[in-house]
């Protein structure tokens, strides 16, 4: 990016590790940050960016625990919905029982790692937000506007996630989390006149100030994955979120392609050329009539397919290469990790290796297809079933009416099977 670049980091509590992954990608691209603003955990991460201490930031998050934030370790498996609900319930109960949780351990963590003088003299404009309590008035400051010894206090104020955490008081004023007045402080960054903004949104609750600066482009980086409960601080989950932030940033900067999964640039470019042609050919094969019946079914299947593609990928990928969006549906159906980077070959090899391990059925011998589908909960099996139908019909040049039923009832599996079918000419040894 040319000119002065601003980095804006939203609030989001335990999800903040994601922003460190974005920082990793920025460093790899040698994007120099001139302005960084943040709210709550975004202010804490922003201070580390201004301090230029990437390794410290990684280490803090890679070793994070709830006890280091609030002297309390709720129990629950962070990688399951049930476990996250247990943690959420435990934190809420503690906040109610104690009339807000004491965040003194967080202050110790900040004091241990942040160097106010270094931040202020870094040459990077570092800004943060907070809100007065109980009046809820915005506090929007840059580090060079306050005394260095007050920076830790203001960062604690910005991070006082009320009503879970207690309001933070100093110099006769009480403060709460900056998200109450400016969750993602783009307007604060714009006050320093950057040429471009990179905004990292953790999708946490908070007030958003409207931004009206069409002349300053904003690159948004946000996750389609679940980054976890706001007050869940776990080292293993944080490391996963760092990876998510890194890969999402790489896609946002155009280094990788994909909406949720990451593929090397140029992947499936040749497949893209025949994607539309094969789709049209299949629709014509299965619904050749020009009457209202076939036309209605065609439109319904297209709507279903588009809905799935936009859910499992994104609009940008759909527009540039729908074959990649289709690959992402297949990746989801076959439970591929979104934390890996795939080449066209590695993805194709992995997909057909998985496909070869699955059982096969002859669709002609299936009586009630709807009842059959209800007994199968594994979408991978359905994907292989549809793939097999497409291959058989191509060889015999026939029209199997059950294929259209399968496509309508299981659109995710249909698209995954269709993607395998697109790749089939390259899989000469696959049976």
Predicted feature residues:
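Patatin-like phospholipase
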Residues: 1-39, 47-431
